Amino acid sequence: ENWQRPPAEVALLMHLLAETITEQLPRMHAHRVGMRFIGDRSRIPVALQQQMQAAEQETALYTDMVLSIAVGYGGMWDMAQAARTLAGQVLAGTLALEQVDVVRMQSAISLGDLPPVDLLIRTGGDYRLSNFLLWQAAYAELYFTDTLWPEFSVAELEQAFALFGQRERRFGRTSEQVQQSLQSTRSTGEGMAGASGESHV
């Protein structure tokens, strides 16, 4: 939807993205961080598309940490393009209609090869997802802040992490089921530690 903003603002955003890629690429190499871009690239200037692709190729072998940047991205677009991909496979006869399920959809969605989103931080005082990562953030914890993105500090990021750590993630289960699962996990871990002679603090 951001393509609907004034042309001058869109052009400025594209320029800033190009500058950011140039400035940050050496840091990506230094810290071995992969860089990837998700979204519909059809409306992005060709020169910037080429720059994005080059950055992805240069950092493709860095898989321990990946920085994913959404450009021209929308959650509904993402699900539609995933559905088209699967529909094409069905039409081509390489996928049976009965095989289309959540797992297949996950494989076709953007970031499908990465774990689901655990924490989604929304800056700028807006209390909505704005069509962002609708599939990937299905079970994400949400953190909203009035702080604008350029002023979002490491201290506030740590605060978001701290609040995230206090939340109980149930994934459809009851609180009692979660606690029972945690107790079972702790008991199993203690038993394994005792058997191996290890101690944990």
Residue ranges and their predicted role:
Residues E1-V201:
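Flexible, compositionally biased loop and terminal segments
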